[in-house]
């Protein structure tokens, strides 16, 4: 497992002379599908649409998982009509990768476009000034990729520099900020459009008595996209910086590659999450923070603004308790989880 830490600020300075060329976030945009599900009634819908209502005890177990998730609702591309047209999506083991791909290759960039357009509108500059596009998704794989499709949808210049990142999982939101920081700071005058777009159709399937991890995936993930525009030296009166990207770091915890896995199979993207993941994060979070913040002389974890990926309520509770955080420190992360579920890469860029 990898932990990515990105330090954003509009007030902090280093001990040494401040570097004026730090990248800034100039705009943020988000988007969600219009269709949404109520978490309290979702177990009834899920077991009915997957023809699994005979699994009464398993359904009640799923209901308990949903009730404990602290998720109120999730927005989904999935509708009853879509699932009835594609029944192979509703069983656990049916070969359905082609069906999923056919839907995702259009839905992922389309949802990404909505977030990107909102970010561009907030930025207030011509779209022709975008020099780089970085796109990320764990929903589907295609070539030409979702970055190419999004560039066409937006009408970006044919000379825009594109980078496509597939299958980076929940870690990707912070990683994308790190990449955007590097691109902006090494390309004077560049403006980097970052887009994360996720559609949980890739992991949707019926229940399996042998794979309880699947129930967690069906309870947890939602659909959404987020976009930010990053650049250096904002032009006074023309651009308004929201955050400064001061530093970015990534730490991989040794011998943890089996704890959290998503694997692309004929049946789609399968999900495995060890029950030890929340405690693993809790045990290692402070060491990661010390390495990231020590150069800035910061050791009081309540003195900083938090954007923690809401991978699940147990993770948020564990980090809060381990670090002695005041309740409001993780309020934004809890609000995103409650209103949208786990949006994978888009979560840390989302506004509750």
From Swiss-Prot:
Record GO terms (molecular function) = naringenin-chalcone synthase activity
Q: What is its EC number?
A: 2.3.1.74
Q: Catalytic residues?
A: 170
- What keywords appear on the UniProt entry? Acyltransferase, Flavonoid biosynthesis, Transferase
- Give the matching InterPro entries: Chalcone/stilbene_synt_C, Chalcone/stilbene_synt_N, Chalcone/stilbene_synthase_AS, Polyketide_synthase_type-III, Thiolase-like
Q: Which CDD domains match?
A: CHS_like
Pathway, per record = Secondary metabolite biosynthesis; flavonoid biosynthesis
* Catalysed reaction equations from the record: (E)-4-coumaroyl-CoA + 3 malonyl-CoA + 3 H(+) = 2',4,4',6'-tetrahydroxychalcone + 3 CO2 + 4 CoA
SUPFAM superfamilies for this protein: Thiolase-like
An example Gene Ontology biological process: flavonoid biosynthetic process
Instruction: Note whether Acyltransferase occurs among the keywords.
Output: yes
The broad enzyme category this protein falls into is transferase
Q: Tell me, what does this protein do in biology?
A: The primary product of this enzyme is 4,2',4',6'-tetrahydroxychalcone (also termed naringenin-chalcone or chalcone) which can under specific conditions spontaneously isomerize into naringenin.
Please state which protein family the record places this protein in.
Belongs to the thiolase-like superfamily. Chalcone/stilbene synthases family.
Instruction: Output the PANTHER family linked to this UniProt entry.
Output: CHALCONE SYNTHASE, HYDROXYMETHYLGLUTARYL-COA SYNTHASE
The name of this protein is Chalcone synthase C
Q: From which source organism is this entry? A: Ipomoea purpurea (Common morning glory)
């Amino acid at each position: 497992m990898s932990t990515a830490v990105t330090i954003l600020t509009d007030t902090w300075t280093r001990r040494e002379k401040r570097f004026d060329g730090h990248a800034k976030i100039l705009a943020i945009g988000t988007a969600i599908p219009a269709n949404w599900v109520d978490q309290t009634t979702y177990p009834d819908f899920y077991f009915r649409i997957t023809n699994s209502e005979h699994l009464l005890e398993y359904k009640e177990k799923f209901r308990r998982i949903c009730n404990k998730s602290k998720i109120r609702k999730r927005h989904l591309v999935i509708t009853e009509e879509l699932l009835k047209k594609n029944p192979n999506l509703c069983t656990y083991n049916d070969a359905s990768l082609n069906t999923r791909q056919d839907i995702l290759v259009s839905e992922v960039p389309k949802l990404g476009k909505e977030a990107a357009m909102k970010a561009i509108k907030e930025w207030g500059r011509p779209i022709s000034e975008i020099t780089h596009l970085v796109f990320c998704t764990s929903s589907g794989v295609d070539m030409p990729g979702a970055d190419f499709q999004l560039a066409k949808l937006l009408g970006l210049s044919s000379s825009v520099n594109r980078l496509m990142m597939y299958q980076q999982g929940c870690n990707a939101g912070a990683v994308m900020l790190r990449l955007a920081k590097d691109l902006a700071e090494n390309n004077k005058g560049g403006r980097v459009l970052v887009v994360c777009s996720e559609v949980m159709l890739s992991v949707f399937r019926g229940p399996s008595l042998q794979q309880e991890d699947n129930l967690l995936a069906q309870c947890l993930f939602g659909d959404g996209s987020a976009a930010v525009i990053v650049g250096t030296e904002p032009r006074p009166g023309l651009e308004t910086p929201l955050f400064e990207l001061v530093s970015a770091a990534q730490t991989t915890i040794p011998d943890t590659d089996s704890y959290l896995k998503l694997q692309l199979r004929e049946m789609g993207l399968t999900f495995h999450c060890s029950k030890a993941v929340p405690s693993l994060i809790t045990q290692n979070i402070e060491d990661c923070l010390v390495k990231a913040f020590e150069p800035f002389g910061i050791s009081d974890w309540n003195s900083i603004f938090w954007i923690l990926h809401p991978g699940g309520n147990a993770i948020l509770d564990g980090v809060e308790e381990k670090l002695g955080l005041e309740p409001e420190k993780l309020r934004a992360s809890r609000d995103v989880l409650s209103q949208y579920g786990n949006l994978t890469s888009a979560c840390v860029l989302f506004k509750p």
